[in-house]
Structures are given as C-alpha cells and as structure tokens.
Amino acid sequence: MTIATAARSVLLALLTLVSSATCVFADVLVRWDQTQAPSKQVLGITTIVVPGANADAVRHAIAEGYQVYVEVDGANVSGFTPAGTPVHGIVVTGNASDADIAGLRTRLKLPADRVLVAQSGAKWPHIRTNWVTKNNDVLQVTGRSAQPWIENNAALLRILQAERPGRTPLLTYRWQPITRSEIDEGPSLEHYLVAIAEAGSFGGDLVLPLHERFQQRLLAGEAAARSEWIEIRRYLEFYSKDFPTRYRPVVNVGVITSHPMVWFETMNLLARHNVPFEVLTPVQLATRDLKALRLLIVLDQPEGAALDALERFTRGGGKVHKVTAGVSDPNSFAFEIRKLLGADDRVVDIWNGITVLIAPYQSPDTDTVLVTVLNYAYQPLPVQLRVRGTFGAVHYESPDNRREIVPHQHRHGYTEFILPALRVGGRVYLSQRSAGR
C-alpha cells in the first residue's frame, strides 16, 4: 500500500468520526454601556450592544452610525420598546418565554436572526489560581505544579449545540474580579483575548462586555488603551472569519443523557482533559447510526429500542461505560475515560499543555482537518500535538502569526508536530496535499 493510499484510508476512517456541522468562527459583539461611544472610525467596528436601560447611550450610538443591538432583560421583554430608532436588533438576557420572544420580533418588525437570546450559565474563561479545597475540615491550597482549574465554556457550548443543532449558541457573562486592582481596572488585555478565542474555538457567539474603566480610557484616548484595543480588534477579526464551509466536530465518544446540565461537571472535566464528545439522548440511540463512535458513556439508562441499540453497539465492538451511582470525582472519571479509550482511539493527544484546550473539526467537502488550540494561561508555550491520520501538510495561523508551515512526522497512524510558542489561540490545518503542492 502506498503512503498516499494509506493516508486516504486513514482519512476515510476519520471522516466516520464526525458529527453535525458547526461554526469554527465567532460573531463577537462588543457591549458598550457608557452614554457616549467613540466613533466607528476609532473603534474600527460597525456593531455594538447597548443596554436598553440607558436610553441616552442607545440614541448616541445610533447617531454615531453604529448598528445597535439593544440589550434587554428577559423579565422586561413583554411590552419592551427601545429608545431611539432604528435599532439593528435585540439581545435578550435572562429568562424569557418563546411567546414573549416571538411577540417582540413581531412588535419591532425584526427578522428572527436579529433577536438574539443569550444563554445563561456561562463564565468568563480564566484559570483559577491557588485553588482551595477542604479535606477533613482542613483547607488545602494547590501547589504551582498541580493541574490548574480552568473556568471554561467548552462543555456548555457542546451541550447547547446538541440541544439546538444547526444554531450557534450566544453567550455572555460578567467579569468576576479576583484582586482589588481587578475590581477597579477590570480584566487584563489577555482576559479579553482568551474570551474571544474561546468563542471562536468552540463554535459560540459572544456578547463581550468591556469594563467601565476600559471604556472610559478609550473615550479619553489613552495611548495604552488604544494599543490594547488594536490587539483586541485583531482577535475579533481573526475569529470572525466566516468560512464558506461549516466544519464538523470530530468526535468518537458519545455521552448518553436526557439531562445534560445535571451531569455538567462530568462533561466539563471531559472537555478539560481534551476528550471530544457529543451529547445524545437515550431516545436518539434507537435512531442514530453509532458506527462513528468508539465509546458510549451511559449516564441515563436507556429502555426499549434504545437499550437494543446499545446492545448492538457492544456486539459490534464498541465500548460502553455505564454510570450507575453518580460521578463523585469528575476529574478521576475523565482520566478513566481517556484510559478506556486507549491511545489508538484518541482523536487528539496533547503534551506540555496543561492549560491548553483543543477542538478538532473536519471539512465535509475537502480532506482538511482543523484543530483549534487555546492556551488559557496566555503565556507563550511550546505544545506538542498528535492528531489521528497521516497528513501531508500541517499549517498554523493565529492572530499573532501569519499562516506558516509546521514540521511534522508520522507515527503509528498519527501526525505529530510542535507549536513552538502558543500564546493564546490559533488554528492548525492538516491536509493530505503536501506543503509544496
């Protein structure tokens, strides 16, 4: 068998692992709540989100020529009319009924895609430092060498994508300061960059709130604030690239549950340990083609036809891990799942990257595999990756680097390579065609 033939065979095997299509870019809307906003020329963006409670801010933003999304709490949707017209759209936060949302669209004569509903439960992504736990009433602080706890939204986005296939979830969250300086000054530049990169890496849209102090510094024209905004805008542009092809997540682990949020922490740790998965309900077991999957994690027990499908999956060589008494330690559970998969069935492996999360995708129209990489520590870090498949070319791009060729090698049906300095986020493209062609 030639190398090219072997490569095509591995690619076909990889293609069987893909699930439903999703976005690998993010529509990030900037939230501005000061009464005045800089001009579009200064910010370099055309659309902003303004709180509906600040009528003067809405009017001023419209007068500046922005396309304005007005933010309204779900409790106030019924009968809401924004100050100033015309508004470009509405962002609803909190809980609102489908009937209230439909009524809002009709009343304001807005198309469905301009009335956006932000999902609750999201967190500003960051690494928790000095994580404190209690053991036998004794407080214990993690050491610097311990696996850091990453607050992230990867699992939440996967759950939301499963609940509404084909629709991109919209997240928003508030900044949670840790130190006194963060209360006064707000997030650092890197916190903004990680937030943008996370949305673009895992297929979510985002309303990005700018801290009050940062907005004031931009209005005052401070040089440092302008410099930081230029970098934020570069990340906005990089992750807003609307690819003509909707990539599909590459997964070979299915999580079976009717109540995913009950099991959120279990899935959160799977995502944390870079185990790509998709969420399936027990009912879907009876109708889905499960050949693509290598392992099913059964959190809610199936019945009837779904149970028969599970038995067929096992007879066909699939692995099943049933949870019958809850998951007391999600972290250990994630390690157990990685071990159960084995090295030969992992889609992606990563070394030297305890603060890095990845997401593999496959183009349905070409032979390209795309892997997003995100370093929550925002410190340049050499990261080694192993991706299933023997690819002829590996390219890397990021907001900080132009597209470049990455040296790679093949080993046991996988392609291995090193990203020498992953600062925040980027994309790796793996294709069958060699770099010189």
Q: What do these predicted ranges mean?
A:
Residues P249-N252, I256-N274, K291-L295, G353-G389:
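Carbohydrate-binding surface patches
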